[in-house]
Amino acid sequence: LNKEYREKFSLLNYYTYYKDKWRIGMEEKKIVVAGHVSLDITPKFNMRTKVSSIGSVIKAGKLVNVGQVAIAPGGCVTNTGLALKKFGVDVKLIAKVGNDEFAEILYEKYRKQGVEPNFIVSEEDNTSYTIVLALNGCDRAFLHDSAANDSFCEKDIDYEVVRNSDYFHFGYPTLMKEFFREDKDELRKMFKKVKNFGLITSLDVTTIDPDSEQADIDWNQRLSEVLPYVDFFVPSVEELCFMLDKNKYYEIQNRASDDVCMHLSLSEDIVPMAEKVITLGCKGVLIKCGAAGMYLMTSDSVRMKELDGKISIEEWSNKRIFQNSYTPDRILSGTGAGDTSIAAFIYGICKGMTPEDTLRIAAGTGASCITEYDTLSGLLPISILKNKIQNGWKEQNFIHK
């Protein structure tokens, strides 16, 4: 009798587990991507060889011959949102622009991707733009005007659209004045409202200029206020290190003569930061480590239980996974690689994939993105990406354990 009971109980667990996985994966999820948008202007550098740093090319008094310029939508809303659209996901975009020519270019570019933008239009602000300096062999640099992003605030969010969705992703509050000002509480208020609707939430940030007012903010304190309402925090290792420990950030910068991500220790640099973030309240942290790959850490099943019915708690609890990057077919530009990899990460969550498979398609998406100058042209359909991985796509082992 005991054996028969155990067998029935085991079959019941098996049925329940796979029934839930089927339901999570087959339901069509509605995703909202909100936050920062800009027009990216990227000149093509005709370099014969790889360079170690941008400073070795761009110097005072020197003329640098460049090629055709690429003009494309940029920012989190574009890069993550349109990548999700390309993956076949139902996605709504929330952002703020000016009433100007740059906005018209953005609208035209979005429509070509099959998206009708319904952005908030400011008559007082211009549309944000970014000049992207992307040279083969070194990390990118940016010249950026936040513009209308600085007046975007929590009240600009269309909460009716959010309420009728399943997943909410917000990007780049570190570049949006109303969201990073210390006398404001916009970021926490927004995520608390969204979380009360029962959505899965994620937060992305971007590089902080050490000479900006954002650099003086106590980001440990700010994150401790916001992350309890964030399920997945998805920063890069440089961004996170600057926020948590500036001294450590400068120490790593000094240690690395070129790409910081190539000089990281998993045990000494990445894992301690991930552990710190988990204590600040989020359920999981995905740290993007550039050419090295990405690291996922999730909390225990007690905290993850809040996402029951939305993801597999058994599969996603207590995870510690470093996913190596994949060898790209070629390297033209790193623009949007992190954002599009996050789009694949969100896709995997919403489709009921395991964390291991989710990280594989996220890393594969990043490696595909950098094969073109713009963000979207190099992206592969998820089915083709999976086949490429299953057929032995070579991983790159750059991380120091």
Name these PLM-found stretches.
Residues K21-I94, E101-K112, I313-S317, N324, ...:
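Glycine-rich phosphate/adenosyl-contacting loop at the front of the ribokinase-like
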Residues S122, V132-E178:
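Conserved phosphate-binding/catalytic loop of the ribokinase/pfkB sugar-kinase fold
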Residues L175-D185, E213, L244, I252:
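Glycine/threonine-rich flexible loop motifs
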Residues Q113-E116, D216-F242, E315:
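Structural recognition of alpha->loop->beta junctions
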Residues L1-G25:
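Short, Lys/Arg-enriched N-terminal segments with co-localized hydrophobic residues
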Residues K109-D125:
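A glycine-rich helix N-cap at a beta->alpha junction
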Residues E182-K189, A215-R222:
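Charged helix-capping and loop-helix junction motifs
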